[in-house]
């Protein structure tokens, strides 16, 4: 996933929320995404772990073509 891609994020106790990627930082354990949400337009950081499917919080919006 790249800058400006539309994504959904997993948050505690609710449905997945749609947002837009504002920044991407790669680490050895996974990838951090700064995602703009409707109620947090300046963004919130979410971490996707490489080693665990339960640690995936950011996913591409289904059915949208992602920018390259």
From Swiss-Prot:
NCBIfam families the UniProt entry points to: PRK10708.1
Any Pfam family: DSRB
HAMAP family named in the record: DsrB
Protein name stated in the entry: Protein DsrB
Domain of life the protein comes from: Bacteria
Family: Belongs to the DsrB family.
